[in-house]
Regions:
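Bacterial N-terminal signal peptides that target proteins for export
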Residues: 1-7
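Pepsin/retropepsin-fold aspartyl endopeptidases
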Residues: 18-397
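Hydrophobic h-region of N-terminal signal peptides that target proteins for export
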Residues: 11-19
């Protein structure tokens, strides 16, 4: 078990800010019931599930293919379990540009999602809410999926465990994946075509802890940049970029991503400047995240390491408005975590670390906050500085 390689990418709200990027007409669609035997999956840039810890404690947790461990937010842990026993300490790295000290609870942890259950000896306790916001109590990873074939239906909002004799439809495309060395990480092949026509046929780590489509790691980016393929990128520094601390990304729009023979055109991706962590690992070309897989019906065979993809109703949906800021939900406000250098938000006077009380008059605690999904082309931010509220208007990029 290699806890240092556990991956989380911060839940930054760049394009959809406080919700996912579902189009307005899709919001009004009548919600269909999930199939019998399936469990609800709420997709909001991450895949959220109702998890039962130790048979009786409900938690809202993210499924992260970049993790081999059960992680529990330290605030949730303290309020629910009190002072733990059999505790240890360890340094943990992830999407941030470094490592951070975490607590290990080796008292044994059973948990279930729907009718499926799993037990792990150890849980990692750390401040996840500074990364993910206050909507998640923790995350679970690949050990829960051992020996299973699992459907992740982003458009339908459910996860389903396939029965042993069930056949996968012929309209799915099978992609043979591989492990990262002997570590349980899913490496998936895909192609990235840049605006100058150059195509990278690469191997990418499947990381459902990352909300974006794709991020090139720094080793791959340095080579491509030297060859002149990463023109017109724009830089953003994150105060909290994931486990391990800060992160520096560069945003650019590419011609297309091709996966399983299907191409998605005009996609905004990032490349990393990190020197440490998951985004500096030269054993793969980068990370591929939820926003890409949300365009498909996905079945993962965790026995044979095969991913099956079928385009869903959101396959051709354009990316939503891009804003030059990233902020994290924190109870009664949003905290500005990053600003695009020279972007509209920075020029309008927004600062990293600012506390946003409301967006277009809507607070994060309001029941009608879904009106911000998707965000309009212009945002009026109520920013609290000291005892004053400052109004800042930000246009999309």
């Amino acid at each position: 078990m290699n806890i240092k390689s556990c991956l989380i990418v911060a839940m930054v709200l760049l394009a959809a800010a406080c919700a996912n990027s579902t189009a307005k007409n899709q919001q009004t669609e009548e919600k269909q019931p999930i199939p019998e035997g399936a469990v609800e999956m709420k997709y909001n840039r991450h895949a959220y599930f109702k998890v039962m810890l130790r048979d009786s404690i409900p938690a809202r947790m993210i499924f992260d293919t970049g993790s081999n461990n059960l992680l529990i937010d330290s605030t949730f842990y303290a309020s629910t379990f009190g002072e733990g026993k059999n505790l240890g300490r360890a340094m943990l790295g992830g999407a941030g540009n470094g490592h951070e000290l975490t607590t290990l609870d080796a008292s044994g942890w059973s948990y279930s999602v729907g009718e499926e259950s799993h037990t792990e000896q150890m849980a990692i306790i750390m401040n996840l809410r500074k990364i993910l916001g206050d909507g998640a109590d923790g995350l679970f990873g690949l050990p829960f999926m051992h020996g299973k074939r699992v459907e992740f239906n982003y458009a339908g909002g459910y996860m389903r465990f396939l029965v042993a004799e069930e056949k996968i439809g012929e309209d799915f495309t099978a992609i043979q994946c591989k492990r990262l060395d002997n570590i349980e990480r899913i490496i998936i092949p895909l192609s990235v075509t840049f605006s100058d026509g150059y195509t990278l046929d690469g191997n990418f780590l499947m990381d459902t802890g990352m909300p974006d489509e794709l991020s090139l790691n720094s080793a791959t980016a340095n080579r491509l940049k030297a060859e002149g393929h990463l023109a017109n990128a724009r830089r953003m520094k994150f105060e909290v970029g994931g486990i391990g601390g800060s992160r520096t990304d560069n945003y650019l729009t590419i011609k297309q991503i091709t996966i399983g023979g299907k191409s998605i055109n005009n996609i905004r991706i990032t490349y990393s400047e990190n020197e440490k962590g998951a985004l500096a690992n030269s054993r793969y070309d980068g990370l591929v995240g939820n926003a890409l897989f949300a365009r498909f019906d996905v079945i993962i065979d965790f026995v044979n390491w095969v991913i099956y993809l079928r385009p869903n109703k959101n396959f051709d949906k354009p990316q939503s408005n891009f804003y030059s800021m990233a902020f994290t939900p924190n109870g009664d406000h949003w905290k500005v975590n990053a600003l695009l250098e020279g972007g509209n938000a920075e020029r309008a006077g927004l600062r990293q670390g600012d506390r946003i009380e409301a967006i277009n008059g809507i607070k994060p605690t309001d029941t009608d906050k879904l009106k911000l999904n998707p965000l309009p082309e212009k945002l009026t931010l109520s920013v609290k500085r000291g005892n004053e509220l400052v109004e800042i208007v930000v246009d999309k990029e």
